[in-house]
A protein has these predicted regions:
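Flavin-dependent oxidoreductases
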Residues: 18, 49, 171-234
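Conserved Rossmann-like nucleotide-cofactor binding loop
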Residues: 15, 38, 199
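Short loop/edge segments at beta-strand edges and connector loops
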Residues: 34, 81, 115-116, 164-166, ...
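Dinucleotide-binding Rossmann-like beta1-alpha1 core, especially the glycine-rich loop
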Residues: 47-122
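Glycine-rich FAD pyrophosphate-binding loop
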Residues: 24-44
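Conserved dinucleotide-binding and phosphotransfer motif residues
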Residues: 26-28, 107, 158
Length: 234
């Protein structure tokens, strides 16, 4: 039997789940569909860095709001506010750092420039080749592997429907919205949100939309357990 929703969200990562929660609070009947498990795609296997210093200036208002959301999640997602530094090692890098961070500060980020003495006092193990550094007290990190569990609990608390291990095979339009043929049945929704991240391109192709998306994979190195070398985000 086809079930009808106000909104179907394809992708159960941070963007999909957080959107579903907010819309459910506003009374929309929403379902989240994910080909794997909630929060176990890119949302669950990243380094978890939460730094305002690496955000684009135009996106700073959204970054500030997002940062406050992470802080509100707190211990449930392993949120820690440590403060963070951005470093420059050459004159050219220092020039770019001053230019970029000044713009970010003007956009609302609490970023300041610190002296080498202040940097050394905070992080004694950093290289002495650093020429310039900026600091943001709001920077920190979260444990990305906990986000799926967090959102699963929140979705259940708010009675938001979700389907895991549910592959979307076909999306078609009709007079009242969209039909989604999936491995767990057919879903009809008045509205559709594609939040599939790196998998967005083939999903959008169902609607004859060719998105210019490229996937770039970063790596995280895991070593034997050691004593901490630094306490801030760098």
């Amino acid at each position: 039997m086809t079930k009808t929703y106000d909104l179907a969200i394809v992708g159960g990562g941070i963007m999909g789940c957080s959107t579903a929660l907010r819309l459910a609070e506003d009374g929309m009947k929403t379902i989240v569909l994910d080909q794997g498990d909630l929060g176990q795609g890119a949302s669950g296997v990243n380094a978890g860095t939460l730094s305002l210093q690496i955000k684009r200036v135009k996106l700073m208002p959204y970054a500030l709001k997002g940062h406050s959301e992470w802080e509100a999640m707190g211990e449930a997602v392993g949120f820690k506010k440590t403060g963070g530094f951005t470093l420059a090692f050459t004159e050219h890098e220092a020039e770019l750092l001053y230019e970029r961070q000044a713009l970010q500060a003007d956009a609302g980020a609490p970023i300041t420039f610190v002296s080498n003495n202040a940097l050394r006092a905070a992080e004694q193990n950093l290289s002495h080749k650093v020429l310039a550094a900026s600091y943001c007290p709001e920077d920190g990190y979260a444990n990305s592997s906990l986000t799926g569990q967090y959102y699963r609990i929140r979705l259940k608390e708010n009675e938001v429907q979700f389907r895991e291990k549910c592959n979307v095979k076909l999306i078609t339009r009709n007079s009242s919205g969209f039909n989604l043929t999936t491995s767990c049945g057919t879903v009809h929704a008045t509205r559709l949100l594609l939040a599939a991240g790196a998998w967005l391109k083939p999903i959008a192709a169902h609607l004859a939309v060719d998105l210019p998306i490229r996937t770039r994979v970063n790596t995280v190195s895991v070593t034997e357990r050691m004593s901490p070398l630094i306490s801030s985000i760098v």
